[in-house]
Amino acid sequence: MITVRMAMARMFAIAALALLAACSGTQDNASTRQLDVLLIPADGGTESGTLADYQPLFDAVGNMADLNFDLKVAQSYGAVVDAMCSGTADIAFVGPVTYLQAKERNCAELLAVAVEDGQSIYYAGLFARNDSPIQTLTDVRGKSVAFGDVNSTSSFIIPITMLMEAGIDPVKDLGALRLTGTHANSLAALIEGRVDVAALSFDSYEKAVRSGIPGARDLRVVARSEAIPYPPLVMSSRLPDDLKQELRQAFKNVEKSPDIQPEMIRGYGGAQVDGYDTQFSSELFDSVARKMTRLSDELKGEILKKSSER
């Protein structure tokens, strides 16, 4: 027979075990360092889709380095730079231009760049509908064009310079200019017929096709850019040197992690990549820096003014 004393003893034993487990959990949580990760709103999917693309990668790195990552998607490219410089973000996925802006303010340094088929490059493009008469960049003159964020490499900086190199003044020669904020918004504006041309990355376009976005397959390429250095992962310059080294080592070996399948290692636009290069030279972004110099603050101001015209 189980007496009251025996029952109470059992209850105390269970409570003691629960307390030990709780204390152990608290210690485990305390030993697991948390880092805040901010992702630019760059791809052709939703915010939840962007998080889903990168969560498996950071989970694997977290297990390898005993780290916990809190991922969020920023509202704009500029917000990511501000977060890195204010110390509210430790790591960020950014475009080349965003990286250069943060680097110039001494807020960020390269962490890793995705590698696919031995390369770390991507492309920007100008797209039109299949039924459009627009065939080349020259045909874009007088047409309405949608661009993304003014700090976006592949949905603004590179496409604008492509037009300029084709002899088209984005302020004087375009019929209308729209700044939609994201690649996905520009793509939607084109599909819905609100603009004649949209500027976005090929990764974002291909993700829209893979995701079955209605109308995405009814578009064609007007022009493709030269190869651009792949959007990097960057880390705060404020992080301790030993932590920076831990992060680099973990990303370098992430494809060897037993906790991750090859299809879980993704990069920009949710595309599967082979792994991450932590030795990528910042000098490889010099070509983008040169493109940036062509867009003066005065020209950007005129573009912003034109984009507000209706």
Predicted regions: what they are:
Residues 78-92, 105, 138, 182-203:
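Short helices/loops that flank or line small-molecule/ion binding pockets
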Residues 40-42, 123-134, 228-242:
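A bilobed periplasmic-binding-protein/Venus flytrap-type ligand-binding module shared by bacterial periplasmic
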Residues 33-56, 234-310:
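An extracytoplasmic/periplasmic, membrane-proximal ligand-sensing/linker region
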Residues 24-27:
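Bacterial signal peptide processing site
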Residues 20-22:
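C-terminal motif of bacterial Sec signal peptides marking the signal peptidase cleavage site
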Residues 143-242, 249:
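Pocket-lining segment of extracytoplasmic ligand-binding domains
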Residues 36-50, 139-155:
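Short loop->beta-strand "edge-of-pocket" segments that line small-molecule binding or catalytic clefts
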Residues 29-97:
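Extracytoplasmic small-molecule ligand-binding "clamshell" domains
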